[in-house]
């Protein structure tokens, strides 16, 4: 018995050559409508679908392939039981299916398209065949993209079969194809009905669930909503449980996420305070209370009204410090009952509980929206160890300096570029963010560090906490000016990616000024 292929496509690109190639391999080609006419006109043997179903097309072509002799041939496993049932009903197995769907998107994009035209371009039989073939991909190769014809033909010519790996890949593409198709239809119908949800149709159905409309977006004149990724069960700002406080705002959620992702970096108890998506205080310490006190003292003016994140359970001692100042929200893996009671004294404080951070799978994708499209990249999970850095100066960093360099390197990754972080004794005492030149960010960070009260009177030089501190830069130093500026404030060591054509000038300046410098070979731009 010859093998059978079913071809029914709206996009005729390459279909004649594909059908001819299959026919040359002994396949019986079954087709419908315009595809049948195209293949027949090219002189390729082809059977009209009604010849195998014994049933005519009806309802103006709305029903053509919805028949057991089509779907039975597609869905049958190649087991003795299924094959016996096919034989009993004179059904031939179908091994290859090439289908792409009515051009719904193209139709509704036309100016003046009517609802009737749109509805008539909602494909029914096509998606049914695509999904049936994809479900039975153990036995059937389903092609929804003409670019795949050559791959399938090549494997059939070389091996007589389509490989399991290719069939699985084709099935994934097929389900994505029908999901996108359904999403386009849902978006059109929502818009046509005057749905007042401005975000209807942005996401593919089933990918996300709408949690709530937000009061507004970044600004009061912007509408906003919060969606949660379906299936994600890890600890994150999007899955955290609100234990107390007012409704979350758009900006709250952005800052909660930024704060939580920062404290994930650390194994020791850590606290981070975020304002406008940038850290204004970060610290690690032996206790959470100490970490929070130092993070807050680093820049108490900026910390007011901020978002706090902790990487371990919040205890009563820490909670007592938090409630001394107005804060928007706090997020942590958990809260002791005593800590929760203390924090709830602040009626407006939003308290968010994530569960253990260790339970989370690493983030895999970072998505940004641009007008007319999306940009997708791997999440920035890069880090370096003491063994991986390269000391490039005559003086190597001392043990304490090295610990601070690695701490600052973790923090600077979470600061808007151009980013500079000044750190000392496990505290970020100065942050320069978002400046268009690097020395400008350094100047801001160094002035903040000089004014920091993270160490109070216990500082080596409490009039200049920057003395003896370290500096981290998210990208290479293009000129020696940052080194020279840092040295004037008492910076003793610098960590940066390296890679500038003027690295030698920065290294020479460090050697001249007694500053240690290490290269990571890794950049951490954040836009």
Swiss-Prot record:
Signal peptide location: none
Keyword Transferase applies: yes
Catalytic activity: (6R)-10-formyltetrahydrofolate + 5-amino-1-(5-phospho-beta-D-ribosyl)imidazole-4-carboxamide = 5-formamido-1-(5-phospho-D-ribosyl)imidazole-4-carboxamide + (6S)-5,6,7,8-tetrahydrofolate; IMP + H2O = 5-formamido-1-(5-phospho-D-ribosyl)imidazole-4-carboxamide
Database matches in PROSITE patterns: MGS (PS51855)
UniProt KW Thylakoid keyword: no
Protein family according to the UniProt entry: Belongs to the PurH family.
Protein name: Bifunctional purine biosynthesis protein PurH
Gene: purH
């Amino acid at each position: 018995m010859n093998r059978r292929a079913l071809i029914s496509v709206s996009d005729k690109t390459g279909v004649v050559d594909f059908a001819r190639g299959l026919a040359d391999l002994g396949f019986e080609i079954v087709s419908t409508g315009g595809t049948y006419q195209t293949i027949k006109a090219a002189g390729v043997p082809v059977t009209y679908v009604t010849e195998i179903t014994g049933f005519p097309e009806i309802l103006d072509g709305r029903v053509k392939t919805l028949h057991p002799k089509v779907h039975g041939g597609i869905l049958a496993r190649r087991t003795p039981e299924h094959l016996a049932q096919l034989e009993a009903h004179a059904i031939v197995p179908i091994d290859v299916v090439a289908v792409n769907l009515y051009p719904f998107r193209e139709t509704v994009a036309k100016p003046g398209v009517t609802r009737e035209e749109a509805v008539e371009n909602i494909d029914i039989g096509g998606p049914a065949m695509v999904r049936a073939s994809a479900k039975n991909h153990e036995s059937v190769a389903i092609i929804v993209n003409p670019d795949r014809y050559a791959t399938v033909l090549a494997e059939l010519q070389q091996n007589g079969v389509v490989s399991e790996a290719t069939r699985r890949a084709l099935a994934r593409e097929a389900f994505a194809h029908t999901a996108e198709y359904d999403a386009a239809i849902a978006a059109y119908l929502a818009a046509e009905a005057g749905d007042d949800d401005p975000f209807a149709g942005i996401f593919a159905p089933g990918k996300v669930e709408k949690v709530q409309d937000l009061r507004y977006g970044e600004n009061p004149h912007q509408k906003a909503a919060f969606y949660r990724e379906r299936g994600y069960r890890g600890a994150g700002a999007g899955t955290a449980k609100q234990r107390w406080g007012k409704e979350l705002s758009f900006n709250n959620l952005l800052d909660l996420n930024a704060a939580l992702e920062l404290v994930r970096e650390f194994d020791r108890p850590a606290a981070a305070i975020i304002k406008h998506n940038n850290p204004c205080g970060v610290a690690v310490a032996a206790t959470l209370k100490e970490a929070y006190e130092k993070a807050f003292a680093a820049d108490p003016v900026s910390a007011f009204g901020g978002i706090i994140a902790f990487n371990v359970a919040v205890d009563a001692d820490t909670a007592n410090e938090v409630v001394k100042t107005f804060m928007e929200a706090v997020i942590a893996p958990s809260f002791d009952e005593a800590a929760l009671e203390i924090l709830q004294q602040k009626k407006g404080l939003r308290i968010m509980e994530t569960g253990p951070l260790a339970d989370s799978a690493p983030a895999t994708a970072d998505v940004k929206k641009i007008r007319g499209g999306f940009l997708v990249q791997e999440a920035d999970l890069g880090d370096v160890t003491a063994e991986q850095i390269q000391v490039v100066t005559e003086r190597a960093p001392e043990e304490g300096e090295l610990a601070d360099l690695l701490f600052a390197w973790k923090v600077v990754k979470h600061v808007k570029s151009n980013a500079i972080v000044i750190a000392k004794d496990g505290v970020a005492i100065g942050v320069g963010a978002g400046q268009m030149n690097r020395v400008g960010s350094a100047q801001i960070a160094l002035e903040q560090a000089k004014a920091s009260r993270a160490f109070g009177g216990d500082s080596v030089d409490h009039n200049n906490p920057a003395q003896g501190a370290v500096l981290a830069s998210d990208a290479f130093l293009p000129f020696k000016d940052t080194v020279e500026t840092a040295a004037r404030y008492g910076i003793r060591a610098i960590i940066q990616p390296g890679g500038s054509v003027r690295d030698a000038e920065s290294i020479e300046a460090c050697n001249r000024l007694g500053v240690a410098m290490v290269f990571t070979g890794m950049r951490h731009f954040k836009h």
